């Protein structure tokens, strides 16, 4: 290829806009040429001519001449030294001195200023890369939940000027920095984030400008030495979920093996994408270049996170939201959840309720003359007629969930039919009603929630105003601290109203913690592992068995301990945790023996700990979870196939074999042991 001819102006532009080294080298070369040129011209003068008066500096005439010229070049005040010399000498020295003034006093200062300005500009625009950064947290993409993740990583609970933020005095050197890669305007992103953070944390946040689908940009994040990664993608970016998934594959290659497995938390914006990821096997995609596992792929969805914050065990610890069964369930009582708005948030709440709402007063088949008291869920949306076919195509087997009735209403919550339903259920003592307003527009959602029928909020009996038990949840997608505080402090009409869905509270460590699920999975993996058909887990389980054999040899009284018994013993937890973690990584999300949804039921199980129906409740939960994932009951054929999502155990609890019922019993026993290490989180 013929080399392009570059004009002089273009060369100058490249130098000016180049890096620090390029500008400095160009300056010194040009300055050196100017000095050399004047030195050569000085040879035209006679040897008896001096440029620095008669003062002898080095005892050598030639060196004194050169030194005198350099002194003039560096200091214009030395011009007086040429007094008495001829006009030609004075003019020559003046020109040389002037060149020094221009180059050293002008061009050098300009070059250094330009370098500093460029550096500042590059930092502000995210163009500066720090190659030695390590033990840092990485956030790829900028979106609504970014500030929430930063607050979580730093342990911040208040606003920018809050005094309840984590005290980092003396911890500056140990606090892990956060590196954010975004394709958005870095200046704007920095301003938005810093406006919501205490000032003392700003020094620990770094910004890179780049694209999520660029290998070089991801490589610049020092993935090989990172502590944890969050892949969020950019807000409203086309193909966001697909790009996030592709980015994870790049991270797996860059991480390499021989290091601690890196946790990569990946946000999937659409519930459909999130559900698909949970159904398919991705194990081979997320390995290092040598084929070994290098990362722990941890998908999450903002809307599901909020549903779990409302009602799940981990999310509900210590928060303000009441359970759906906010009273003790008696024989004829039932939970009734009304969801207004069938958008992503509404669907997430529906799916979470389907996993959670399994109670001891449901009797399969009306056994012993008792009723089949089912949970009721009503979903209201004015576009339901168009939205429902798509939803049922995505979740085709929800009709396998036998203890929950779902009703889809094409209309508005303002319709007389819906308003009358809310009043009737509020007045029905057996109905535990919760209304969740999930509209996307914060103002519309607020006005809709506060304009429900008055009888939903209070009643008048014996000439006295009494609050009803109905709970009302109002989605506020934006950060609405002011409105939230007003509602929280209201002890009158709106005392049972709470806001939810805020973007600054959608992610927390409790929600992302899979330890309990990991331990339960390890329990079943070890219990049912077939040593006659060894696979990739064989070495892990073999090491575990050897370790346990040594412990039992030292103390035979521990011979009956199972994995859960060992893991709750502080002196053995480290080894057991590592074993559970390795086994957890070998299986895809929906192939594990336990998951976060099972743990989310622990609060409900704890509330009804003395009920003989706990095992049935666990099986009903499992049926619901498998149905949501996409498993079809194959009880008639007896086929069990994970690839085709067929399972023969999606049947009533009483129809299960004794062996299968024992699995549900084990879940309850394991729950009791694991929860013995924690304060009981159940709420009445």
Walk through the language-model features, giving the residues of each:
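Short interaction-hotspot residues at assembly and binding interfaces
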Residues: 641-649
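Short, motif-level signal for alpha-helix interfacial/capping segments enriched in acidic residues
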Residues: 631-642
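C-terminal non-catalytic accessory extensions
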Residues: 664-672
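Cytosolic regulatory regions of ion transport systems
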Residues: 1-35, 44, 48-62, 77-621, ...
